[in-house]
Amino acid sequence: MGIKGLNAIISEHVPSAIRKSDIKSFFGRKVAIDASMSLYQFLIAVRQQDGGQLTNEAGETTSHLMGMFYRTLRMIDNGIKPCYVFDGKPPDLKSHELTKRSSRRVETEKKLAEATTELEKMKQERRLVKVSKEHNEEAQKLLGLMGIPYIIAPTEAEAQCAELAKKGKVYAAASEDMDTLCYRTPFLLRHLTFSETKKEPIHEIDTELVLRGLDLTIEQFVDLCIMLGCDYCESIRGVGPVTALKLIKTHGSIEKIVEFIESGESNNTKWKIPEDWPYKQARMLFLDPEVIDGNEINLKWSPPKEKELIEYLCDDKKFSEERVKSGISRLKKGLKSGIQGRLDGFFQVVPKTKEQLAAAAKRAQENKKLNKNKNKVTKGRR
């Protein structure tokens, strides 16, 4: 699910922490990718012309494999060396979120049964997409044959991606989930595995710039994210993103905020603290997650197993042999070239001061107001 409203807060208060770039900008980088999130994207986005999922003659879904094969090739073509991280067992605290998802699934199935148009049916079917154990296993088999390393995390894939980045095994963690920032990955890449046809730039978020720009410690940032709404517990009812940030900056921790609300000083009867709120346990899952020590992991990219890859994709899954062979050639070329040095590796980046970050935030807000006024003028002329 990620963190509700966090991207908007960063965009408004620390716009310089988000850099939008073309995929070519990451040439020479190693990246740890949240595999479960990517597979979910592929199952939704990689479709036939009629909107249905891709399948082979036996009726087996192949959208996830098509997405994994060709999106990985795109990264390799652009000089990126990806490794994928799969979710392990979810933390016990996540059970409440999984229960909510199950309830929503039942409701969606009901809406699908009642749908009368093909468009509505397609919409509800996409909401029912779920990454299964079989999808994960098939993707892992494909990556092994392609020569791309993968890891099965003890629990959350995002936490393991962040660990690899923190230990210097990769440059960044790649996921659509903003909660990856809570694990203090140096950089978070969003939209990396999107289709090229979307023309969506990759968003690179600098975690340390976010912390400095918001003037929060990592502990306070995690508390903010819990207040905004995360997968591990409920948030304070009635408190939106703007108020959550204000409360954290004023009081410094959830404990102090709870004291403030319970004392009656807030004069706000709409704010409701959840009963038996496990925010402390949620905080520790972010600050001290269960991961494999990055120093113990050796990432290795190997030449693709050409014969086995053709058998798996072409014979078993009925992919086009011509296209698969072309993909194998691209893989061989990309993986053989290795990681070349980047010019920015020879220069030390000078951290931005609080004043510079504040000035950038002010400029962004002024531009936002200017664009709003322009839109009003345009509408008035119509």
Swiss-Prot record:
Keyword terms, alphabetized: DNA damage, DNA repair, DNA replication, Endonuclease, Exonuclease, Hydrolase, Magnesium, Metal-binding, Mitochondrion, Nuclease, Nucleus, Phosphoprotein
Chain segments carrying region I-domain: 120-251
GO biological process, one term: DNA replication, removal of RNA primer
Primary location recorded for the protein, binned into one broad class: nucleus
EC supergroup of this enzyme: hydrolase
Cofactor remark: Binds 2 magnesium ions per subunit. They probably participate in the reaction catalyzed by the enzyme. May bind an additional third magnesium ion after substrate binding.
Molecular function in Gene Ontology: 5'-3' exonuclease activity; 5'-flap endonuclease activity; DNA binding; magnesium ion binding
Region spans: Disordered: 358-382
Domain of life: Eukaryota
Organism field: Saccharomyces cerevisiae (strain RM11-1a) (Baker's yeast)
EC number annotated for this UniProt entry: 3.1.-.-
Comp. bias (Basic residues): 370-382
Protein name: Flap endonuclease 1
Residue numbers spanned by region N-domain: 1-105
GO cellular component: mitochondrion; nucleolus; nucleoplasm
